[in-house]
Amino acid sequence: MSRIRQAFAALDGGKALIAYITVGDPDIRTTLALMHGMVANGADILELGVPFSDPMADGPVIQRAAERALANGISLRDVLDVVRKFRETDTQTPVVLMGYLNPVHKMGYREFAQEAAKAGVDGVLTVDSPVETIDPLYRELKDNGVDCIFLIAPTTTEDRIKTIAELAGGFVYYVSLKGVTGAASLDTDEVSRKIEYLHQYIDIPIGVGFGISNAESARKIGRVADAVIVGSRIVKEIENNTGNEAAAVGALVKELKDAVR
């Protein structure tokens, strides 16, 4: 059983908290401390952002984090090194990489999939890869035991949902809002209806992200989704607490996890 499946199974019907940070923001050492701290405070799955110069799906908070990481010279290989170091002391917590196709394409799909598996990556989500064109990367990830994770939006067609249901591993990431990460408003009734609809086709967990900014919104989403995904709010905490990132993020993650238990 994969680490992601084990993580959901261990919750015994409870809801997972998936916590996102951008690797290298503010630096590699802090990234590792944040990863361990988030797990200690209740994060069930870690989602690591791969810095990219044109993060079109990300709002301003995560865009700034990517800029800071790129200014530090962080590359995809550095991200894999971070996972490798994390695995020296944590062999249980699932780690998912979230980013854009360009850095993966530059490395080569086969090399990337092999190196990701060796480093201890459990899943990969490339936000700008339509399901219709992802087959070359999907095959390499599958051959190396790494889950290919897909986004589903409110506008995703039924045919595309069916295709994703056949290919997806680990969990499916439902984008609760039209727009970019960090967007403000969240209609939990609409999300609930959509999750119920999606589970007619999808038999793996569905996590909901975009627009979850506090314990109350996490609690509401946790009632209807299998996992609550929080990114911009955590990254903003890093941005606003220079020198005290780990403590600030740890406190936030604990608050969020308490809300979704």
UniProtKB/Swiss-Prot annotation:
CDD domains in alphabetical order:
Tryptophan_synthase_alpha
Entry keyword Amino-acid biosynthesis = yes
Disulfide bonds, paired cysteine numbers: none
**Biological or metabolic pathway of the protein:** Amino-acid biosynthesis; L-tryptophan biosynthesis; L-tryptophan from chorismate: step 5/5
Q: Which SUPFAM superfamilies match?
A: Ribulose-phoshate binding barrel
Q: How does it assemble?
A: Tetramer of two alpha and two beta chains.
Described by its record, this protein's role is as follows: The alpha subunit is responsible for the aldol cleavage of indoleglycerol phosphate to indole and glyceraldehyde 3-phosphate.
> What protein name is recorded for this chain?
Tryptophan synthase alpha chain
